[in-house]
């Protein structure tokens, strides 16, 4: 449906902020705002995750592929010695 609506300045700013936050068009931001308000849905809460410093790596991960290849070679030698 097409219609003309006159928005108060503060309401326009709310819709434009929603557009920027969600990277959507004016139409989608306005429709979503009306749906959220009409359905009584609360605004999504801000999600954050705490971080922790785990220190210096105990294993040099730059050599991870070489380490995996060495382990595979050792396993093959072990199997050959066992006769499997």
UniProtKB/Swiss-Prot annotation:
Keywords: Toxin-antitoxin system. It comes from the Bacteria. Probable antitoxin component of a type II toxin-antitoxin (TA) system. Its putative cognate toxin is VapC37. This is Putative antitoxin VapB37. It comes from Mycobacterium tuberculosis (strain CDC 1551 / Oshkosh). The gene is vapB37.
């Amino acid at each position: 449906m097409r219609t003309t609506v006159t928005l108060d300045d503060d309401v326009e700013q709310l819709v434009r902020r929603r557009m920027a936050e969600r990277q959507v068009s004016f139409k989608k931001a306005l429709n979503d705002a009306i749906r959220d308000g009409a359905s009584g849905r609360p605004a999504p809460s801000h999600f954050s995750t705490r971080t922790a410093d785990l220190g210096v790596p105990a294993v040099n991960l730059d050599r991870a592929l070489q380490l995996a290849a060495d382990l595979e070679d050792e396993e093959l030698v072990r199997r050959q010695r066992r006769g499997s």
